[in-house]
Amino acid sequence: WLDEGPFGAGTNAYLVQSWVREDRIVLTPNWMYWESGDYNINRHTMTIVTEASTRLLAYTDGEVDFGGINIEDLVNFCYIDENSNGALDAGEDDALDDKPNVASKDGYICTYRETFTTTLAAFNLNPKALDAGEDTSNTDANSSLVLNHDSTGDGTMDMNVMETAALREAISYAFDYETHRRETYDNSLAPQYGPIPTGFLYASTQTETFTYDLTNAEAILEAAGFIRQYDCTTLSLSDAPTVVDVADRTGNECRLPNILRIMANEGNDYRIAMAGQIAEALGTIGVATSGDAKPWAEYLTMYYTRTWDIRFSGWAPDYLDPDNYWSPFSGGDSIGGDAYGTGYENAAVNAALVIGRTSQDDATREQAYLDAFAAWIDDPNMIIIGQYNGIGVKHNDVGSPPYAAIGSAHWFDYDKLPMVDGALVGSC
C-alpha cells in the first residue's frame, strides 16, 4: 500500500519518501499541502526498535526526539522535587511515586497526564490454527478454525472452548489486576472496571467485578465441566489430545483440549509481563498456555490469521463518548463494533448499546449502560485492566501541540527550536 497508494495518501501533510518493512519509515513534506513552504519539520524518520535499552540509549544520546521510554527508565530524565526547592537533590530521582508533581532534569520536559487510554486483553471466541506448511511470518497465511468443544453432547466438536462464557469468566479471575497496576506499570494505571474510563459520562454504571481469585477461577472451570482429564504432554494448538483414564488420573492433568495462545509483542515489556503472569496463573489451575513474546512479523501474522486466544492491546478514544469504548470493545460486528476481532455477539449487550448510542435521554442512556455491563460481566470478551495516568518526557527543544485527550497529535503540529551560538532560541 505504501508503494502503490495515491500521491499524498494517508499522511496529507507529509509523503512517504522511503520505507523498510519492520524497520523504518521516512516522511517528507507534501508540497501540495505546504504551498508556501512554511512546514515546521523537513523530515520525520520513525524507526522500530524492539529493545528497550537500545531505545533508551538513542534517546539519551539525542539521536531521537521521541522514544518509547519504559516507565522504570523515566528516572533518567525526571524527578520529584520533594522539598520544593526547584533543584534536583540527592535521592529525589530514586522513584517517581508522586507522579502529578513531577519535575524535569536539565534538557528535558516531563509532564504528568491523566488520559482515557485503556489497557486491555481481548479474547478470541473463534481462534484458528495455521494450516500445515504455512509461514508464521506470512500475514496472508491460511488458517482453519479450531473446533474442540461439543456444545450439544452429540459427540461432534462444533465450537471452540473460547466461545463458552464460563471459560472467559474464569480467565478474567486469573489476572492479577492490582499487581500490574501498581508494579508492572508503577502506579501508572488507574483502576477501570468496564469499557468506560473514569472521567467519561456513565462511568459509574460499572463496578469492580473481576479480581485476582484463582480459587474462584478453578471453581468456575469445574462447574462448567472443564475438569482435569487431558494428558498435558499430548496437548497441541489444534490436534486432539489424549484423555487420561479416570483410574489413572493424578490431579495434574490439563483442563482444556488445546493450548491457549497469549499474544504479546517483543519490545513491550508490560505486555510481556502481563502475559507471563496470566500464563503462569492459568497453568496452576490446569490450563496450558503459550505466551512467549513474538517478533512483530509473527505477531501480525497471528493477528491477521486469527491464530490467537488472548491478546494484550490498548485503546485511545477518537471522541469523548462512552460508546467510543463500549461498541468497539464489546459491541458485536452486527452493530458496527468488535474492533478487536473477538467474534463476540451478545444480544443483550448489543441491544443496550444501540439504545445507549441513539437515545437523547440521560436516564435512558444510563440504564442502557447499566444493562450492558450486567450482561457483559456474565459473558466477558476481554480483560479490562486500567487507564493510563503517567509521565511523558521529551527533549526541551521539541515543541508539542496542546494536549488533547482524544486521538493523537499530528506530525505537522510539532516543531523544534533552533540552536544559535550553542543556545536554544525560544522555549517549548
Which stretches of residues belong to each language-model region?
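Surface-exposed intrinsically disordered loops and tails
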Residues: 1-9, 78-108, 128-163, 230-259, ...
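Gly/Pro-rich hinge or "lid" segments in bacterial periplasmic/extracellular proteins
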Residues: 1-43, 51-54, 214-223, 420-421, ...
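Envelope-exposed proteins and targeting segments
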Residues: 10-12, 23, 40-42, 117-119, ...
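Short, well-ordered beta-strand elements
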Residues: 12-15, 25-26, 42-47, 256-266, ...
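Extracellular/periplasmic solute-recognition and catalytic clefts
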Residues: 17-28, 47-144, 178, 182-183, ...
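Detector for C-terminal structural segments
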Residues: 20-24, 29, 112, 116-119, ...
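Periplasmic binding protein-like
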Residues: 59-60, 64-69, 81-90, 94-110, ...
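Extended ligand-binding regions for polar small-molecule ligands
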Residues: 125-182, 349-366
